[in-house]
Regions:
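Conserved pre-motif I regulatory segment
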Residues: 97-140
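Walker A/P-loop
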Residues: 132-154
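A contiguous, basic/glycine-rich beta-loop/short-helix subdomain that forms a polymer-engagement track
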Residues: 245-265, 270, 281-287, 381-499, ...
Length: 679
């Protein structure tokens, strides 16, 4: 204050959170430069000849760990400030040059095929219009119709015309990215100038697999001091493939994931998981919390309601907390703040008044006032503990696994309670879940004001119901693209088999007989889909044919090996898979790579506490709980599985539907219009 009164000098503090084990010996260069920039701004705005700046490191509790004062003249501040700006000025100029070249190439861009498939041109017009009007579009596009090209091409045209600033192509699974990558590869054959980036999960990109902290990872230490030069190098490369991004990250010793996050700011197209745009815990804040000049193309959008519910839900697992508390007690002692905070939450869970009817799960109308308080305190204690470096090796993984659901639970409790149900599971050590019911309201809010959002899928059907589930407004367009393939190319036959849970043991014999008859009558390559692993194994024991069986846990190499039997020329193949799994969506087996599929059951989700709570919610809000909670998700999985058969105009094949319910009008209404089902 004395310096300010004299208007000759001013002290400018930059206070930073210190997460290291030992007090710092010197300020981190980026932190010092931040303080210098503030000092320069003070000198300019107040006409000061000099300024005192100070970097102060404190713990989360406010304890000072280090102070580094420095006196600089106004000229020294100006010189350092300009040195910081220069790389960004070079970046802005490079981006502008690229944008001019990109827009010129996009103006000349032509559709990547000689002719549009039926409905493709109309779909492209709908996508372009949605971007131009900044509206949402809900589109049902049968499998094999070239949906990636039909959505990316008009979006890129809009990008070149300045109707949007970036295009994000969102997928539910890694396997579903290939269609977008193939479409971009075909467009690149026209000398397209485009920075297209693919974001993989952080754990998949990590080359060190150590704790993500500067004290443990050399790539994390000083990352943001080195990434400016790396970004400049990337701007001189047209191909932003995962391999090239990783190579530049390796060259500059950068974290590949954080480097990709930085590149997101200037990329033209980003292909990534739903989470990076929609999950409040992990979405790219530098993009979606600031600019709205972004277009979303959301593939396999029928997954969105369930995925959004998962994103918005959170839990407090009493049993998991007890196990972690034991580890923390051994490592840090029972007086450690984290141990005490976990004890408070465990005690709060134990004190909940559960029904005395002997049930092991259910719902709670509300939670005590102090429950949220102790959960918030535990989250703070977790964050403090992650800064400490006493022996955490045994608890490191469990710490994160427990922290993330807890943080999600705390976020959920801060939202409108009417959008949630409080569930409890397990009587001895209960798990308490804040279960999100309303995905529509959140999706509507998250996409409000963006430069067009297109939700598309082969199973976004019936469109009015799906638009309702995703919070679409009445003026948001719906478009049903007709199948471009002759219906007679796909022979669909239904056989009455009672696959309901109580009859599965006896149904296995008939299912095995039907599979055997099909592959004997017409040898070839077939996929058989079951509603569960248990049903699959039960039938496999009765099937006297050589076959491969999907496992619960399969990495990418195992999945590729599983599909090798189909991608090799000639021969026969028979595989038993789970409906709704990785082999029923997002895989492309054209031509003679796949001759047919068998679908056992109608795909209804397993009856459990969560589905029953959803059913009751939809019964109250939409009038038909069973339709929205069970039938729609089930038939969407069935349609996806059958969609594996016909991928091109010349493909032919068969689909065998084994369940008597396929003859019911309620289920027939949920089938695609181009299906011709015989008995």
């Amino acid at each position: 204050e004395p310096y300010r009164r004299q208007r000759q000098m001013c002290i400018r503090d930059r206070i930073k959170l210190w997460q290291g084990e030992h007090p710092p010996e010197a300020p981190i260069p980026a932190h010092r430069m931040q303080a210098v920039c503030y000092g320069h701004m003070l000198c300019v705005t107040r006409g000061l000849p000099a300024v005192d700046v100070r970097v102060v490191y404190v713990t989360r509790r406010g304890k000072v760990q280090g102070e580094f004062p420095e006196r600089l003249t106004a000229e020294e501040c100006r010189a350092e400030f300009q040195s910081v700006l220069l790389p960004y000025l070079r970046r802005i100029r490079a981006v502008r040059r690229h944008t001019r070249a990109r827009n010129a190439s996009l103006a000349a861009l032509k559709f990547p095929y000689a002719n549009y498939r039926p409905g493709q041109r109309e779909m492209a017009v709908q996508v372009y219009t949605a971007i131009k009007r900044k509206k949402r579009l809900f589109a049902c596009m049968p499998t094999g119709t070239g949906k990636s090209s039909a959505t990316l091409f008009p979006a890129l045209k809009a990008l070149g015309e300045g109707l949007t600033g970036q295009v994000y192509y969102l997928t539910a699974r890694t396997t579903q990215r290939q269609g977008a990558l193939d479409a971009l590869a075909r467009l690149h054959q026209q000398t397209l100038r485009l920075w297209a980036l693919v974001i993989d999960a952080k754990d998949k990109q990590c080359p060190t697999h150590t704790l993500c902290h500067p004290d443990y990872c050399e790539r994390a230490k000083g990352h943001f001091l080195r990434d400016t030069e790396a970004i400049e190098e990337m701007m001189n490369i047209d191909d932003w493939s995962a391999e090239n991004v990783r190579a530049v990250a390796d060259k500059y010793c950068l974290c590949p994931f954080e480097f990709a996050m930085s590149l997101c700011e200037i990329a033209d197209v980003v292909i990534c998981d739903y989470n990076y745009a929609l999950d409040p815990a992990v979405h790219i804040r530098r993009i979606f919390d600031a600019a709205r000049d972004v277009t979303l193309l959301i593939d396999e959008a029928h997954h969105l309601p369930e995925r959004i519910r998962d994103m918005l839900s959170g839990s407090v697992d009493s049993a998991g907390l007890r196990k972690l508390r034991t580890v923390v007690g051994k490592a840090a002692g029972k007086k450690h703040p984290l141990y005490k905070a976990m004890t408070d939450v465990i005690r709060a869970v134990d004190n909940l008044l559960l029904p005395e009817d002997g049930s092991t799960e259910g719902t709670l109308p509300t939670l005590p006032d102090d429950f949220d308080r102790v959960c918030l305190s535990l989250a703070d204690a977790f964050m403090d503990a992650r800064q400490e470096h006493f022996p955490w090796e045994d608890a490191g993984g469990r710490l994160g696994d427990t922290l993330m659901p807890l943080l999600s639970f705390n976020r959920a409790r801060q939202r409108d309670s009417a959008d949630y149900a409080i569930l409890w599971e397990g009587r001895r050590h209960p798990k308490i879940t804040a279960f999100a019911l309303d995905s529509a309201g959140y999706f509507q809010q998250a996409t409000q004001g963006l430069s067009g959002v297109t939700c598309f899928s082969a199973t976004l059907h019936p469109l009015p119901e799906m638009r309702l589930l995703l919070g679409g407004a009445e003026d948001d367009a719906c478009f049903a693209m007709p199948s471009p393939f002759p219906p007679e190319h796909l022979q669909i036959r239904q056989v009455d088999v009672n696959t309901r849970y109580a009859h599965r043991s006896s149904a296995c014999v008939e299912i095995a007989r039907q599979i055997t008859a099909l592959v004997t009558r017409k040898p070839g390559k077939y996929l058989v889909f079951f509603p569960s692993f248990a049903f699959l194994r039960m039938t496999a024991e009765r099937l006297m044919l050589p076959c491969q069986v999907q496992e619960k846990q399969m990495d990418e190499a195992a999945r590729a090996a599983f599909l090798d039997a189909y991608r090799q020329e000639g021969g026969d193949a028979l595989s038993l898979c789970v409906l709704g799994g990785v082999f029923s969506e997002g895989i492309d087996l054209p031509g003679r790579q796949l001759d047919g599929v068998v679908v056992v059951g109608v795909g209804l989700p397993q009856v459990n506490l969560y589905q029953e709570v959803l059913r009751a919610h939809f019964e109250r809000t939409l009038g038909d709980g069973f339709l929205y909670a069970y039938m729609l998700p089930g038939m969407q999985k069935v349609t996806q599985a059958v969609g594996r058969v016909i991928r091109t105009e010349t493909d032919t094949g068969v689909a065998l539907l084994l369940d008597d319910r396929y003859s019911y009008p309620a289920y027939r209404r949920l089938m695609p219009e181009h299906w011709r089902v015989s008995r």
